[in-house]
């Protein structure tokens, strides 16, 4: 299936940006954005195999960012966004409770945007049998800006994240689960100055009432 889409969006400044805290600015204007997409998807083998490609272009103006005016920090409609790129994904339901999936995205930013990686690759798998289910995935991130204008640009080195989840459905009301995140204990930041947790494991109970 081939699809094309053009959309226009805007975001009004929230009360916090207009009137609260030291960087407030009651004169902020709405952010404006245009988005263009062209996508193609295909299913094979009775729907057990699927894959697709998506091309996009995004242009935005009056983006609200922190700046300086009269010697103080203040929020301003000073930033622009102009991004284009491509995304691809594929999935395969193998059978016997097994399935695998993968996706990749490439992003080109004319004006760097924090927390938006240029390259993102993911591969994962799932297995379910009876009351048990297990899923795992590995994600590679590269070209991630953790800070951008008006701050000095900071670009994170590439890193790999591995997550794992398992669950047991005890009965129709109770499910026990355990989850591990960043099991390779990578050191990385999404926003400059805020390190993300290293290897973390936790579990719990889920009630279905």
Where are these regions (language model features)?
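Flexible, solvent-exposed coil segments and beta strand-coil junctions
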Residues: 13-22, 65-72, 102-106, 142-148, ...
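Residues on the lipid-exposed face of transmembrane beta-strands in outer-membrane beta-barrel proteins
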Residues: 38-42, 88-92, 123-127, 136, ...
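Gram-negative outer-membrane beta-barrel transporters
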Residues: 50-60, 76-148, 173-175, 184
């Amino acid at each position: 299936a081939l699809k094309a889409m053009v959309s226009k969006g805007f975001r009004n400044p929230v009360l916090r940006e207009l009137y609260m805290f030291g960087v407030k600015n009651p004169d902020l204007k709405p952010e404006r954005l245009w988005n263009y997409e062209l996508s193609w998807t295909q299913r094979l083998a009775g729907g057990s195999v699927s894959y697709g490609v998506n091309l996009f272009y995004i242009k935005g103006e009056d983006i609200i960012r922190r700046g300086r005016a009269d010697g103080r920090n203040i929020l301003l409609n000073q930033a622009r966004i102009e991004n284009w790129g491509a995304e691809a994904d594929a999935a395969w339901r193998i059978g016997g409770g097994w399935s695998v999936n993968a996706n990749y995205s490439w992003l080109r930013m004319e004006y760097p945007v924090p927390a938006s990686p240029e390259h993102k690759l993911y591969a994962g798998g799932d297995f379910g049998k009876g009351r048990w289910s297990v899923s795992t995935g590995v994600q590679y991130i590269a070209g991630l800006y953790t800070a951008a204008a008006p701050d000095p640009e900071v670009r994170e080195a590439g890193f790999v994240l591995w997550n794992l989840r398992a669950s047991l459905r005890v009965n129709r009301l109770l499910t026990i689960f355990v989850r591990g995140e960043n099991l390779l204990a990578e050191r990385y930041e999404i926003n400059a100055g805020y390190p993300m947790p290293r290897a973390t494991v936790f579990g719990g109970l889920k009630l279905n009432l």
